């Protein structure tokens, strides 16, 4: 935990001279990582599920708005399922998190992002599985006619690949561990749709239940990206590792030490604070998406016989 910019975020986005030396020393390993990732994806067995399968992914490790994007577009359709890995959940294998809004498991079993999707998408079913093909097959079993795949670019599926591109890219366009890319930056050319922040979509934020002295508490990737949306009433920032669970006793200690009047958290963090007795303010994030982007996704979905305009 740190209250300033985390080391890894500095390393990938604003490296010091010493960190730059380390980056170039590790570059040969980045080339190996890149080669393995590309070969693994392109040589994997091809799967065709015969329904619209839309992958909302990114080339960069960590958060880039995939969950908010799915939250924004999934309600536009009927008979939808979302398939995700379920990061940092305490379960293994395939788990049905919800069926058309009926939540079947607790947050710890689902993972924070999948649980957030289940809470907000009342018309959709949410499934988590390390093996995405099993998740898609379960979605079909549940009657889904459209499936959104959270972070599915690296899978060799017959799917519509939408890649989110951040407004501020990493300092170097290298793969891990010298950079933050999981595949070559040239892979953007392989996507059906590249969706760029501030060009194809805008982030719209608001704060529910604001107070005069808010303590920011978050466990998301690249947390300093929230800085542009924070009000002056934030008295301190506490950053935790992405997807980390919160120590409620530690939060209570920091709360009183800083004379805070509420904890400011994101919607993703909120699902892990259901047992927190401290006052909570919520930083709500929504996306305003260019209609042309939505039209391209609609056209793909309508290209399948199982879907009609009435389903949109």
From Swiss-Prot:
Entry keyword annotation includes Lipid metabolism: yes
InterPro entries (UniProt xref): LpxK
GO biological process assignments: lipid A biosynthetic process; lipopolysaccharide core region biosynthetic process
Pathway annotation from the record: Glycolipid biosynthesis; lipid IV(A) biosynthesis; lipid IV(A) from (3R)-3-hydroxytetradecanoyl-[acyl-carrier-protein] and UDP-N-acetyl-alpha-D-glucosamine: step 6/6
Reaction(s) the record says it catalyses: a lipid A disaccharide + ATP = a lipid IVA + ADP + H(+)
Gene Ontology molecular functions: ATP binding; tetraacyldisaccharide 4'-kinase activity
Signal peptide: none
Record-stated family: Belongs to the LpxK family.
Protein's UniProt name: Tetraacyldisaccharide 4'-kinase
Species this protein is from: Helicobacter pylori (strain HPAG1)
Underlying gene: lpxK
């Amino acid at each position: 935990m740190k209250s300033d910019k985390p080391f890894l975020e500095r390393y990938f986005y604003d490296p010091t001279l010493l960190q730059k030396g380390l980056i170039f020393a590790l570059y040969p390993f980045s080339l190996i990582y890149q080669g393995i990732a590309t070969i693994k994806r392109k040589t994997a067995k091809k799967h065709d599920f015969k329904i619209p399968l839309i992958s909302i992914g990114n080339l960069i490790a960590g958060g880039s708005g995939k969950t908010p994007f799915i939250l924004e577009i999934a309600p536009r359709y009927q008979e939808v399922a979302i398939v995700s890995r379920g990061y940092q959940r305490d379960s293994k294998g395939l788990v049905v998190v919800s069926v058309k809004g009926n939540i079947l498991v607790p947050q710890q079993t689902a993972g924070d992002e999948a649980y957030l999707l289940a809470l907000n998408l009342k018309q959709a079913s949410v499934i988590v599985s390390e093996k995405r093909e099993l998740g898609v097959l379960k979605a079909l079993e549940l009657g889904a006619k459209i499936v959104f795949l959270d972070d599915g670019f690296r899978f060799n599926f017959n799917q519509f690949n939408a890649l989110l591109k951040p407004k501020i890219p990493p300092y170097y366009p290298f793969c891990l561990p010298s950079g933050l890319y999981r595949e070559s930056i040239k892979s953007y050319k392989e996507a059906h749709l590249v969706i760029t922040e501030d060009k194809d979509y805008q982030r719209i934020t608001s704060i529910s239940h604001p107070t005069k002295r808010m303590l920011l508490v978050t466990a998301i990737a690249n947390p300093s990206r929230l800085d542009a949306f924070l009000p002056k009433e934030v008295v301190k920032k506490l950053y935790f590792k992405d997807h980390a669970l919160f120590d409620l006793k530690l939060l209570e200690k920091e709360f009183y030490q800083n004379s805070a009047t509420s904890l400011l958290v994101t919607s993703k963090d909120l699902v892990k604070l259901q047992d927190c007795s401290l006052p909570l303010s919520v930083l709500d994030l929504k996306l305003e998406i260019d209609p042309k982007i939505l039209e391209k996704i609609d056209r793909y979905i309508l290209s399948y016989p199982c879907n009609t305009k009435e389903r949109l």
